[in-house]
Curated annotation (Swiss-Prot):
Family in the record: Belongs to the conotoxin O2 superfamily.
GO cellular-component term (any): extracellular region
Disulphide bonds in the chain: 48-62, 55-66, 61-71
Name of the protein in its database record: Conotoxin Vc6.16
The UniProt record lists the keyword Signal: yes
Tissue spec: Expressed by the venom duct.
Propeptide, residue positions: 20-44
A GO MF label: toxin activity
Protein's job: Inhibits voltage-gated ion channels.
Free-text comment on this protein's domains from its UniProt entry: The presence of a 'disulfide through disulfide knot' structurally defines this protein as a knottin. The cysteine framework is VI/VII (C-C-CC-C-C).
Localization, UniProt: Secreted
Signal peptide span: 1-19
Amino acid sequence: MQKLIILLLVAAVLMSTQALFQEKRPKEKIDLLSKRKTDAEKQQKRYCSDDSQPCSHFYDCCKWSCNNGYCP
């Protein structure tokens, strides 16, 4: 009987720790996605070379046209 109680306690502890780890993982994924989004926004705000000429080819947003010196 004592072995059964100990086994149930161990199972409960394992399940609770697993639930804690599962709660932390989605937050990390969301943080990574938001970081990627802000990095992309920074690249889009990169200054372009000249309004009258096509932008430099270093950034895709500047390949085709400039908008007041900034990526459109």
